Amino acid sequence: MRTASIADKVVVITGASSGLGESTARLLAANGAKVVLGARRKDRIDAVVKEITAKGGSALGFKTDVTKRVEVEALVKGATEKHGRIDVIVNNSGIMPIAPMAALKVDEWDRMIDVNIKGLLYGVAAVLPVMQKQKQGHIINIASVAGFKVFAPGGVVYSATKFAVRALTEGLRMEVKADNIRCTIISPGAVATELTESSSEEAIRKNLREFYKIAIPPDSIARAIAYAIEQPAEVEIDEVVIRPTALEY
């Protein structure tokens, strides 16, 4: 059964070639949304689009590196040129190269800031004028439980980026509510995705794999995103924290 409040919504999703982004794209498309997908892996995006459309869904795909502002702008432009509007953006792209601060993985710090913070801001910058002109829209940003409690040792910079996502989203909400634009933070715990492979250190990847044995499937997060989207226009879900029942962190 299709959910009427999701059907026909135009939804842009970054990081949509796997994990949370892919699961969200598939779920929303199955419920009648017109999904516009961006990710670095063009071959994978094309495969997801092909599978969605083969099932009767509406999907477009664009090669999108969120660290490149012009590519994020092209993703949003592609959505508006095809559909004439954007109802929702899910800023999902993120990386988690865990390492102790003393390891001085400065390049990885830079990369996390570029993807997790600046990439999200590029998504907001691209879509906000469209939504303000429409006088409606919904910006959904993926944070983490690490945005509530610093994940240390090892995840200090990652946690900092997710604290930033929560602060940026709440501040944005206060600024754009007059334009009838909703803002939602989704803060997952351990989810079975490729995120655990972000670290450059094999020992850390091994520990993460062990820790993530209790991880929940990505469609759990997709359902939370769908729940936020399907609310009436006057109802805003500010934040959803979702994690494995067994997870203490």
Question: Which residues are covered by each model-predicted region?
Answer:
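Substrate-binding pocket helix/loop in short-chain dehydrogenase/reductase
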Residues: 100-101, 108-113
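C-terminal helical subdomain
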Residues: 181, 185-186, 206-249
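The beta1-alpha1 cofactor-binding region of Rossmann-like NAD(H)/NADP(H)-dependent oxidoreductases
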Residues: 42-43, 63-75, 106
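Residue(s) in the substrate-gating loop at a strand-loop-helix junction
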Residues: 144
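Conserved glycine-rich cofactor-binding loop
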Residues: 17-18
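Active-site helix of classical SDR
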Residues: 124, 161
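Conserved glycine-rich Rossmann-like NAD(P)H-binding loop of the short-chain dehydrogenase/reductase
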Residues: 33-47
